[in-house]
């Protein structure tokens, strides 16, 4: 096939007549190299040193051109401090393929690059190394290009330098031109084969970290899908690996035990320069260890101490130089291997082409019917064809390559089956979710706070069980029709996994239905209990909690029998689990009732004041009490106060159990005027979770109530004193008033105006007396006199002559008026 031009898919501007397209390309390239637009660098580029020259000599001593590797590293104290916290990266690729240019852009190095004006000769000789990054956390190796004319057919040096890079690098980049993909020599596949073999031989005695190989496809073409390029390269790699003869302990080891592979691509450097720079800057992020998508994962780190890197590199290079195990197989074996491999590749390609229709079906998301029958037949035909064509070659090689071909074919079918299984799993998962959701939506309609019947849920429990059985049966049949015989053992786990997922989905649906049923029951029972206990909370009687407990016990006995029946018929719960769920449900309902009591805390001051007034300020008929001299105010006051504080004590604790009645949260005093106080610590045996009013709330409420109690008590004493006055007027005083006021009495009777005025004033006084308003009138008169006197004194105080005198007999008292007003109120 003709070689594809690198500029085939790009459009060039018209060229000057005096320059050829080649000349202009060279000019553009040189200008790009010398242009300041190349890369914006935040620090001085690192030139690095040549650690292995073109003759294979290691930089173990200083020369006039460069220091030794040891001294170079010692001059980088920031690198020495890193210990093993750094990463190494190298690059492989053909000569003059832009490896050094790529490294310079990625790592801010200054490796020597190609100048086409001087010819396409070798620019990198041997191996160069530089430290990159602000903290010198990346070691960069620039390797001499492969397939160069300078070394002609001598491949041993490039193999050794490649193997050297594998031994020290966490990440190894392989620089490929896109048009070289698929070419065994041009794409360095022959070199990779040698690298794989020697890698196993050199490190067979120790467990070494894996190496990440990153293929960088240069000058990508627009009409070639990158996914296809990636697949082609991986197919080449897997074919190479299948031909590698590993040591005995690694016979069955897959390639990913030793290597991981990733792929990326870049546009043409000259024709799409700005796109190239932009994508290289994106690629830089992959080489940032702090990036979550970094190439520098811990499993790739070779864990070589920074201060021992120079010694390690020198020793490993000497080991590679002295390696004697690079001889090729015998000619006959080589011919057999080559031809069998070629035939195997051809048959594999034909097989791959023959199943493209099935691949398209799977790619579109459709399932292949009779997958097992279709692909088993094709694999058998391909292996039979291979035997016919290779019967003249070495039997051992034929059998070996046949086994490899069978693995490849089965691997390809296995990859297709993975997609088939993925689609089947997705379809069955969608079906499970859809059918279970339909059932869930149906039983959700049963929710009704006014009614609860567990038997209605039993119907949907049976429907869930039937649906699960049908889906499992269909899944088994579909799986058996799709799994080839050679995948039977491998796919058992997948089959069991899906069956497990179906079971999990079923158990989840049953659990959700049980939860809905339990929530339905809880809401139903709460809506039944709360209206029945609310009147007891409002009544504030001593038997409040007893009545509440009676209501709850009755409803619990009747209700939880239904819930237990629902658990038994609608779920697979055992006896202990059912008891546990019922216990949780009871706790939830009791907590909801407790919340109802807690919400009434804001009404508690009003309820307690009303309770005190009903007992102290009102009589048995509900009328305001008229205090007589013979009434025992103290006894009634303490009785009302004790009763009120008992109500407060009931609200302090959630007394849902009969044993809770024993706990006391307030202390009543009878000596002097000491106020009641709340107990600071919980009574012994009390549950803190049941406390409704904490100590601070109780204390604040009691202080408020004490003020209210004392005001009521003082008012009662004053009314009692007023009522005693009318019984204390002497009889002789009445006779003297009548005797000396007789003339005035006759004058009033004979004067109509005075008589009417006397009747009005007397009637008012009588009504006030009957209504016990004497104290109010007295206070009001005192208030008027006090205000008048205060106003007069304040006016006289403004006159300088009277100010000293007024200050002596009438000192300022801003609270005097306020206290009088408060007394009147």
From Swiss-Prot:
Residues 83-305 form the GB1/RHD3-type G domain. The chain crosses the membrane at residues 729-749, 753-773. GTP binds at residues 93-100. Residues 750-752 are lumenal. Residues 373-397 form a coiled coil. It is a multi-pass membrane protein. One of its GO terms (biological process) is endoplasmic reticulum membrane fusion. Its EC number is 3.6.5.-. GO terms for cellular component: endoplasmic reticulum; endoplasmic reticulum membrane. Probable GTP-binding protein that may be involved in cell development. This is Protein SEY1 homolog 2. The lineage of its organism: Eukaryota, Amoebozoa, Evosea, Archamoebae, Mastigamoebida.
């Amino acid at each position: 096939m003709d070689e594809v031009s690198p500029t085939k898919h790009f459009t060039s501007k018209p060229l000057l007549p005096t320059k050829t397209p080649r000349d202009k390309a060279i000019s553009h390239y040189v200008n790009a190299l010398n242009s300041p637009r190349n890369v914006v660098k935040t620090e001085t580029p690192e030139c690095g040193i040549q650690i292995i020259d073109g003759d294979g000599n290691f930089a173990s001593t200083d020369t006039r051109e460069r220091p030794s590797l040891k001294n170079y590293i010692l001059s980088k104290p920031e690198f020495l401090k890193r210990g093993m916290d750094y990463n190494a990266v190298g690059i492989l690729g053909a000569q003059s393929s832009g490896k050094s240019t790529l490294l310079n852009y990625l790592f801010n190095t200054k490796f020597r690059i190609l100048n086409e004006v001087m010819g396409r000769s070798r620019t990198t000789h041997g191996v160069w190394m530089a430290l990159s990054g602000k903290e010198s956390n990346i070691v960069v190796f620039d390797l001499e290009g492969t397939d160069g004319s300078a070394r002609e057919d001598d491949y041993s040096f490039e193999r050794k330098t490649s193997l050297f890079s594998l031994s020290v690098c966490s990440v190894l980049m392989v620089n490929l031109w896109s048009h070289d993909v698929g070419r065994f020599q041009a794409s360095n596949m022959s070199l990779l084969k040698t690298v794989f073999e020697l890698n196993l031989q050199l490190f067979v005695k120790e467990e070494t970290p894996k190496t990440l190989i990153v293929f960088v496809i240069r000058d990508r073409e627009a009409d070639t899908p990158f996914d296809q390029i990636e697949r082609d390269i991986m197919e080449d790699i897997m074919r190479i690996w299948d031909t590698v003869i590993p040591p005995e302990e690694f016979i069955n080891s897959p390639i990913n035990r030793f290597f991981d592979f990733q792929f990326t691509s870049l546009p043409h450097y000259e024709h799409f320069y700005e796109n190239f720079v932009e994508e290289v800057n994106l690629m830089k992020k992959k080489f940032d260890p702090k990036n979550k998508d970094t190439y520098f994962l811990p499993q790739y780190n070779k864990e070589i101490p920074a201060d021992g890197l120079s010694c390690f590199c020198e020793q490993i290079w000497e080991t590679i130089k002295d390696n004697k195990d690079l001889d090729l197989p015998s000619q006959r074996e080589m011919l057999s291997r080559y031809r069998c491999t070629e035939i195997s590749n051809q048959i594999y390609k034909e097989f791959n082409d023959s199943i493209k229709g099935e691949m398209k079906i799977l790619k579109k998301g459709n399932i292949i019917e009779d997958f097992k029958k279709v692909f088993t037949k094709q694999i058998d035909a391909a292996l039979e064809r291979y035997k016919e064509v290779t019967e003249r070659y070495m039997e051992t090689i034929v059998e070996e390559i046949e086994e490899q071909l069978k693995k490849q074919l089965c691997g390809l079918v296995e990859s297709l089956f993975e997609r088939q299984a993925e689609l089947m799993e997705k379809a069955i998962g969608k079906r499970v979710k859809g059918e279970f959701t339909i059932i869930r939506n149906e039983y959700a309609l049963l929710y009704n706070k006014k009614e609860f019947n567990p038997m209605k849920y039993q119907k949907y429990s049976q429907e869930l069980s039937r649906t699960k059985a049908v889906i499992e049966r269909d899944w088994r049949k579909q799986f058996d029709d799709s799994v080839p015989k050679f995948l039977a053992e491998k796919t058992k786990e997948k089959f069991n996994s899906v069956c497990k997922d179906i079971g999990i989905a079923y158990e989840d649906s049953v659990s959700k239905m049980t939860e809905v049923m339990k929530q339905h029951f809880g809401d139903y029972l709460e809506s039944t209990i709360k209206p029945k206990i609310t009147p007891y909370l409002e009544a504030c009687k001593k038997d409040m909690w007893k009545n509440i407990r009676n209501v709850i016990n009755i409803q619990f006995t009747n209700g939880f029998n239904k819930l237990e029946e629902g658990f038994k018929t609608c779920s697979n719960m055992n006896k202990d689990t059912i008891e546990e769920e019922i216990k949780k449900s009871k706790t939830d309902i009791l907590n909801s009732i407790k919340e109802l009591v807690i919400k009434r805390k804001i009404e508690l001051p009003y309820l307690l004041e009303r309770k005190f007034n009903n007992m102290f300020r009102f009589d048995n008929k509900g009328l305001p009490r008229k205090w007589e001299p013979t009434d025992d105010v103290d006894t009634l006051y303490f009785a009302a106060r004790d009763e009120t504080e008992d109500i407060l004590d009931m609200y302090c604790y959630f007394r849902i159990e009969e044993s809770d009645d024993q706990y006391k949260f307030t202390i009543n005093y009878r000596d002097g005027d000491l106020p009641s106080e709340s107990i600071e610590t919980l009574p012994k045996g009390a549950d803190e979770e049941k406390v409704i009013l904490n100590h601070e709330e109780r204390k604040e409420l009691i202080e408020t109530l004490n003020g209210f109690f004392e005001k009521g008590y003082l008012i009662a004493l004053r009314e009692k004193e007023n009522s005693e006055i009318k019984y204390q007027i002497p009889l002789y005083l009445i006779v003297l008033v009548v005797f000396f006021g007789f003339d005035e009495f006759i004058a009033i009777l004979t004067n109509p105006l005075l008589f009417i005025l006397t009747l009005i004033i007397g009637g008012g006084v009588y009504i006030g007396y009957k209504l016990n308003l004497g104290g109010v009138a007295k206070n009001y008169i005192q208030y008027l006199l006090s205000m008048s006197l205060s106003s007069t004194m304040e006016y006289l105080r403004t006159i300088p002559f009277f100010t000293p005198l007024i200050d002596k007999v009438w000192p300022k008292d801003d609270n005097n008026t306020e206290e009088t007003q408060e007394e009147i109120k």
